[in-house]
Amino acid sequence: GELSDPEPGIGEVRVKLHASGINPSDVKFRLRRPLDFEQIVPHSDGAGTIDYVGPGVGSHRVGQRVWVWNAQWRRPWGTACEYVVLPEAQAVPLPDAMSFEQGACLGIPALTAVRSIQLAGSLAGKTVLVTGAGSAVGHYATQMAVLEGARVIGTAGSGARREDAEQAGAFSVIDYKQTAVGPRVLELTQGAGVDAVIDMDFSSTAALLSENVLKAHGVYICYGSNTTGILPVDLKTLLWRSIDLRCFLVYDLLPDDRAACIEKLSGWLEQGRLQHRVAKTFRLRQTVAAHEFVESGSKRGTVVLRI
């Protein structure tokens, strides 16, 4: 349907969108009942050009190419539209060398990955297990861990995802559908285990703790779980091996933590250090088909609407 063009308020900018990224969480939000608002424009991530600024925002920002984050977090108006109004900080400069489609891949996947890397601490010379290393988040996390000097072991559930993880820099990728992950990790680390785990699904990966895949005093970073609620955890392993369990929700980072993530990410983007994967593009009028493609589970990278 048609909406009137929004106008920015104090401290806000209006972005003329050229691309809208669709994450699995956007599909989940769409399916959730009851809906949070009577009328919703979906999607948190996108990229475009600032064309209008509100009071308190410098006029130098007009014309800037930007990528945006959390557009539809706790508010109804996301990026599957022509214009979005956001607080100024949520529109981050996009390097000229990057396309708008690539910029629309960044918000949730790249910020989740960089926050995971920061929580893992110094990674130089260490070994990291990245579950789902061929996923949108895992692909970025693998690249970033390698940039920080780590050796990455990844997991993947298909040949295509394995190939993506290897291209991201993983030195070994375990097909978790064909090979028991725990014994293989111990084999690859000569029985020592890894220094850190960056995990997309706590409900399935937490069981590996009792197999000692994570070294004593290691760090386990959890950014998601296919099953939530009460889950079994081997507390004895956590306690007696002094495991540091760190969980976070990328939508709800503390301001200083998010600023640090954006600063780190922006440096890599300016230097052209990261690969970006656009799985497939659709037109805005094809939003339904785009969501169905995400739901199919066959995407490699981020599905993007071109606006």
Task: Locate each region found by the language model.
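Short amphipathic alpha-helix with an adjacent loop that forms part of the alpha/beta core around
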Residues: 181-191
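Glycine-rich helix-loop-beta junction characteristic of Rossmann-like nucleotide cofactor-binding loops
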Residues: 118-123, 189-190, 212
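NAD(P)H dinucleotide-binding glycine-rich loop of Rossmann-like/cofactor-binding domains
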Residues: 59, 69-132
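Short glycine-centered segments of the SAM/dcSAM-binding site in methyltransferase folds
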Residues: 65, 127, 151, 218-219, ...
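Glycine-rich beta-strand-centered segment in the early N-terminal region that forms part
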Residues: 4-21, 31-72
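C-terminal capping/lid region of NAD(P)-dependent oxidoreductase domains
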Residues: 271-280, 288-307
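Glycine-rich phosphate-binding loop and adjacent beta-alpha segment
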Residues: 204-274, 307
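Mid-domain Rossmann-like dinucleotide-binding core that forms the NAD(H)/NADP(H) cofactor-binding site
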Residues: 104-178
